[in-house]
Regions:
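Terminal low-complexity tails and localization/encapsulation signals of metabolic enzymes
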Residues: 1-33, 66, 70, 102, ...
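N-terminal alpha-helical segment of soluble enzymes
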Residues: 25-94, 296, 306-312
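Residue-level signal for inorganic ion chemistry
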Residues: 28, 64, 86, 108, ...
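N-terminal Rossmann NAD(P)-binding subdomain characteristic of aldehyde/semialdehyde dehydrogenases
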Residues: 57, 68-161, 199, 204
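ALDH superfamily catalytic-core signature
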Residues: 226, 234-361, 379-392
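Conserved glycine-rich beta-strand-loop-beta hairpin in the small C-terminal domain of fold type I
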Residues: 347-351, 368-374, 393-397
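Single conserved hydrophobic/aromatic residue that forms the stacking wall/gate
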Residues: 398-406
Length: 406
């Protein structure tokens, strides 16, 4: 299936018919093409959203809620087709793909349900110590911002776009979605459900294309009132620099740590860490990316990690370059003295899990977000040392966990 741009509810090819072929990370099979939008088309999408906002912001909230419900119903009817597209395009197994579609639909429903109770607020003077009720009255109303620019990543093109878009729509904002190039086929199919549901012209627009062509054009457009982005820290910092003070919602990369203490249940710990590190080949911003373990239990935990990881086989990374990066990090760590306790195998862009012990701060793997199936283990001598190492790392911290029975 070929994707199209969605601008003012029209399904369009890119200017000059510029396209990019899409191949599955599973076996390299051809899936279709995506249009590579021009800068003029990116601006046209924002223009459509800006024009549509003038009427959409005046639409009753019940109308918006009902349109979201209708979109959710259409998504439910197309669940298998949407899940299969996601599976083939970004390399998730079919169970993970179905889960993403289901979660997205449930999020739409939850957003619509929650919006029913979102109204203005009335406060009287007696909420403050110095005033009586009749002396002051405060009326607070909710007002939509305008055009929202949503930018989604390849690994959760549906979940991590709908969490930006559904709340924006129900509160009377209009949206331009810039999807990652990988994931655009699935995103296009998903968001045509909103057009089918009857969302008015220009309320939701879909753009895909090279960031060099359309990225800064959209980021610096003064009609954009908020930018919501999920992706790498590098790109997030660029957005912060060029966005001219526009409100930002940024979810960036993370080197997510687990701190394992000597009284932890190691069977439970190993199972949780391995699942967190290697599901979807570690291609998640919240994947477990480094383990700090007290020295007295290091050997036992590592063996349990190795045993648990043996249940994972070759799985695709999004492309060969991603697999190359994992191999580079592994070789750098081994060169600097790390010990390979679980060796990975590779076939093209597919990798099986690798676990490295004796990882230290001199190694790139200690600092860099690997976004793949390789897990570094660092030895510590106390909880305070572990906490300080987690806090002091140069890399970003999106989340952390600790395991202890005390």
């Amino acid at each position: 299936m070929d994707a199209k741009l969605i601008i003012d509810n029209k399904l369009l090819d890119a200017d000059n018919n510029a396209t990019k072929d899409v191949f599955s990370p599973w076996e390299g099979q051809y899936l279709g093409t995506i249009p590579m939008a021009s800068s003029q088309q990116a601006k046209a999408a924002i223009s459509a959203a800006d024009k549509a906002w003038q009427d959409w912001k005046l639409t009753t909230i019940n109308t918006r809620i009902n349109l979201l419900y209708k979109a959710a119903d259409i998504i439910k009817s197309k669940r298998e087709d949407l899940a299969l597209s996601l599976c083939l395009e970004i390399g998730k197994n079919i169970s993970e793909a179905r889960s993403e579609i289901d979660r997205a639909r449930e999020y739409i429903m939850m957003t619509a349900d929650s919006a029913k109770s979102l109204r203005g607020s009335l406060y009287y003077g007696d909420v403050f110590d110095k005033y009586q009720k009749h002396q002051k009255t405060g009326l607070y109303s909710r007002y939509p911002l305008g055009v929202i620019l949503a930018i989604s990543p390849f690994n959760y093109p549906i979940n991590l776009s709908i969490t930006k878009i559904a709340p924006a729509l129900v509160m009377g904002n209009t949206v331009v979605l810039k999807s990652a190039t990988i994931g655009s086929l699935s995103s296009f199919q998903f968001y045509t459900c909103f057009i089918e549901a009857g969302f008015p012209l220009g309320v939701i627009n879909f753009i895909c294309g090279n960031a060099s062509e359309v990225g800064d054009i959209m980021l610096t457009d003064k009609r954009v009132q908020l930018i919501a982005f999920t992706g790498s820290t590098e790109v997030g910092n660029h957005i912060r620099e060029v966005s001219l003070g526009v409100p930002l919602l940024l979810e960036l990369g993370g080197k997510d740590a687990a701190l394992v203490l000597k009284d932890a249940d190691l069977d439970y710990t190993a199972a949780q860490i391995v699942s967190g590190a290697f599901s979807y080949s570690g291609q998640r911003c919240t994947a477990q990316k480094i383990v700090f373990v007290e020295s007295s239990i290091k050997g036992e935990l590592i063996q349990k990690l190795v045993d648990s990881a043996a249940n994972y086989s070759l799985s695709p990374l999004i492309n060969a370059a991603a697999a190359d990066y994992i191999e580079i990090l592994k070789e750098d760590a081994l060169t600097h003295g790390a010990k390979l306790v679980l060796a990975s195998s590779r076939s093209g862009n597919k990798l099986s899990p690798a676990i490295l012990a004796e990882v230290t701060e001199e190694m790139r793997l200690y600092h860099e977000e690997q976004f793949g199936p390789i897990l570094p283990v660092v030895t510590i001598n106390s909880i305070s040392e572990g906490v300080n190492k987690i806090k002091d790392r140069k890399s970003t911290r999106l989340n952390s966990s600790h395991v202890s029975e005390s």
